[in-house]
Amino acid sequence: MERVIDCFLPYIDAEQTLRTVEALLAEKEIANVCLLATKANAEPIEGCSMLVVEDFTSTATVKAIAAHAQSEFTLVYSKHEMLLFGYKALQRMVIVARDIDAGMVYADHYTYADGELQKSPVIDYQEGSLRDDFDFGSVILYNTEKLKEATSRMTANYKAAGNYDLRLKLSQKYAIEHIPEYLYTDVVCDTRASGERIYDYCDPKNNASQKEMEEACTEHLKVVGAYLEPIDFEDVDFDSEKFDVECTVVIPVLNRVRVIRDAIKSVLSQEAPFKYNLIIVDNHSTDGTTEAIDEFAADERLVHIIPDRNDLGIGGCWNLAINDPRCGKFAIGLDSDDVYATPHTLEKMVAQFYKENAAMVCGTYVVTDVNLKEMAPGVIDHHEWTPDNGRNNLFHVNGVGGPRAFYTPIYRATNIPNTNYGEDYAMGLAITRNYRMGRVYEVMTCARRWDDNTDANLDIFKENANNLYKDRIRTWELKARINKNKNSNKQ
């Protein structure tokens, strides 16, 4: 098994790239090394060819790589730092790719970060793995013949979404396979906490690239049969059931004694032209949270529920609250460490249901510290959402926004997963399959960041578990929408 791989890697300068080139040329599977340079006068490196490109992310660059690749396999390395393969690792990747006739394979790896060698596992690719920031690692091995065929179907000319479009095209016909073995070592580039990276798709400076990602994802949904037309919505009958109150705020809580009082006060101080209440599902707190909630017991609007079971996650607590007979026509969420940003949050959220005939409404929030001082990334308004294509674009982004509110009868017909992550996103996907989601672009909630946030800085294993689960949710919803379209076509 010799000389079966053409390798392509970004070229910044000779000194930075030379060690990686030497390591690659020492591997007997490597036939050719091609440097992707953005300058025509870049200094050559002995033993390498050079391909001048405008960038490393465009359709033009992807197609140029495919056109220049001649060996059985094409390897693309996406970082500028040193790359070192494990013993017989390239042979392993080639064998797996051949054995299963994959279009693309990728692997777990080690990463140097802060002077230490750390494990960097990645996750399996699924049909619903449609996030544009899916982490394949920095090394991807393509079957060259399949790479060329996939690029022949790339008709759009993207500046930022070239690689994203390529893997969507590959996935339509070929296997994208994860090798759960540590096969190489690279250097970490993005050292931000997971709680910071999740907002990248909401950053206004990424609007142009995110629009490209949306276009690529939408085209993919059309190809696989999961695209939903903007006119295909069911109407919501807001008089289908009678409720004692118009609106209920739901707060699931576990051990948040330092912040729960602020959350309760922000709810009970709401000014609304209708009757509302607050249901707190206290999931067996042991730090004084229960007693803190009881300080407000004199207010008849407060319903304090302690479950008689011990197997509820955040989703299960939501289900318990909304299926309680005291729940109102609309249920609006509030995290136990957050507060409403305005005394008119409930009024504006409820009004949006009627305005858009929506089964679910999402607001806008601002990220603050515990003292309500705004901090990066600031206001998260999800302006990537559009009434026409929002429910399709929801597959490629990683959240629906907040605060989240639901029309209770439709919620009760589905309920959300009994998990501590992704449960709201799952409901957003499920509801928008058939109904409209409304949006409020004024700040409704202050999402407070403090030292006890559960999602501020996850380790790689927890982050992977969360992403794997969310991709599973997307996969199920993708199949549900394909079935919906098939059944509609039969009628």
Question: Which role does the model predict for each range below?
Answer:
Residues A37-P44, M82, D282-E291, N310:
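A conserved acidic beta->alpha catalytic loop
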Residues M82, Y87-K119, H344-P377:
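Conserved donor NDP-sugar-binding/catalytic core segment of glycosyltransferases
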Residues D55-A69, D308-R326:
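Glycine-rich, basic loop-to-helix element that forms the pyrophosphate-binding segment
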